[in-house]
Amino acid sequence: MKKLPVSKYLQTMRYAAANYVSRECIYPFYASFKVTHVCSLKCSFCNVWREKTPDLVKEDVFNVIDNIANSSIVVLSLEGGDPLVRKDLGEILQYAHQKPFYLFFTTNGHLLHKRPMKEYGKHIDYLHISIDEGHDNLKFFDRLEEFQSYGPEICIQIVVTKETLPVLEEKVKRVYEVNARTVVMPACHLDGTDDFYPDPKDFRAEILRLKKKYLNTITTPKGFLDNINTPHGCSTSSVIIDSDGGLFYPCRTVGKHLYNFTEGSFMKFLKTPEAKEARTAMKECNRSCGWYQYFATDVFASPRSLYSSLSPYILK
């Protein structure tokens, strides 16, 4: 994992302090950028593949990345769809890796064997590979050692439904055996999909049990497990950027495209009355969708949750 400039860490602390003083998360620290909606799969719990949002050309992708680099964001995750479908992905990764943030990369893994992953890996800090029943790739658990050879630290992303919660342990055990990490998240109920969301209390209990049994393997923070069992556990400390550069704000569940990262400063947008009104709407939302990105990113504000998330990397 690369080291960021000291000035970036100091800047992040200032933004965190500003959030604390204002008692609202004005400045986010985590962003996922869906560089494409194209995907080879049609997961039953996902609605991204149903959307027809166009992808940006490479030059506009660079503009989005520049805007992110000049913001409070300290972690950028390139996602999709499956970003491996982009033919210009190598150039995008190389460009993003030069910027002052940690670069995550998430894929369903079905195209890994067709791409120069060891070359791509030089520009990725953390490689997330989604493996579960929904992604129809459970056989990939037999290839974890291969994935580790690409270079970056790998983290297996496991989406759990109410039906698959009882068989989660065998997946976690396999990740543990190869000294890798896994982030386990519930299949939140998205618009236009069937409801596969597991009981949040049962999910919390099982993850805590497995975290204790398979030490330093599951990165899902305890703060997330607590947040999905409270009425308002979500936060705007994380944002999702659509494949056309549009920002879902305050979240992708109930938000709208209020801003586009190809047009003007993101930091200026966050200070607008429109943005503040959206954050207020999030606080008043009673949906409790359990979307991992919005319910887990309090790790940036809570030292206890931060340790819960990072300790598998630090202690193992």
Language-model features: locations:
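Flexible, active-site-proximal loop/turn residues at the rims of small-molecule/cofactor binding pockets
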Residues: 52, 82, 133, 188, ...
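Short, P/G- and charge-enriched loop/turn segments at secondary-structure junctions
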Residues: 19-22, 224-228, 276-278
